[in-house]
């Protein structure tokens, strides 16, 4: 089932009720951004849930492994990613976009079953639970704009650049919270790094 959360006449209440159902495991890949949206919108964190990226890390697939890699490695399938950078705010969505959206979740059940069995066999359930505790904590999604810089990964030791990153991260967080949009839609981290490094003095720069 495809659900368009931007549809003006669609109530998402049944979906949120499902999120609260303790008898249904909700499976995500790289859940943090999705969970943050649900928490900001309804103060709900789906439970119980399973993050295939976290589980894959515990199973030795590496940190922050992508969904596409897991589909190839576990399911021996490929994904059509040609619609990834199309305009997802435009309506109606094209058939190709809807096919992409379906593909983005089609293999989650198979990946979940493979990883959960591997975790049980290796007796690493506690490792996964420890990682998921962070994602289940409401404090994870309550961001003070002053401290938004802590989420930004940088190797720079330049105090000027670090100060610029702190200001840019604070502005982005404030704006994203005011407009209720993902922070990456304001500007992404790589764009922030470039701005912090060059520190333009005018719009022309």
Model-derived regions: residue spans:
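Conserved DEDDh/DEDDy metal-dependent 3′-5′ exonuclease domain
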Residues: 1-118
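Accessory DNA-binding and partner-docking regions appended to nucleic-acid-acting proteins
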Residues: 95, 111, 115-205
């Amino acid at each position: 089932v495809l659900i368009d959360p931007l549809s003006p006449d669609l109530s998402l209440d049944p979906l949120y009720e499902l999120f609260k159902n303790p008898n249904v495991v909700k499976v995500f890949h790289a859940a943090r951004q999705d969970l943050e949206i649900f928490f900001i919108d309804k103060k709900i964190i789906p439970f119980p849930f399973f993050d295939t990226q976290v589980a894959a890390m515990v199973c030795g697939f590496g940190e922050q492994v992508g969904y596409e890699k897991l589909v190839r490695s576990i399911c021996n399938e490929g994904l059509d990613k040609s619609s990834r950078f199309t305009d997802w705010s435009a309506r109606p969505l094209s058939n190709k976009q809807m096919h992409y959206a379906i593909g983005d979740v089609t293999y989650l059940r198979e990946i979940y079953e493979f990883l959960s069995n591997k975790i049980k066999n290796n007796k690493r359930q506690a490792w996964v639970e420890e990682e998921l505790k962070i994602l289940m904590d409401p404090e994870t999604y309550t961001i003070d704009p002053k401290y938004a810089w802590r989420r930004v990964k940088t190797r720079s030791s330049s105090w000027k650049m670090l100060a610029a990153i702190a200001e840019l991260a604070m502005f982005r967080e404030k704006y994203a919270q005011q407009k209720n949009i993902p922070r990456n839609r304001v500007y992404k981290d790589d764009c922030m790094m470039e701005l912090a490094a060059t520190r333009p003095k005018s719009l022309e720069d």
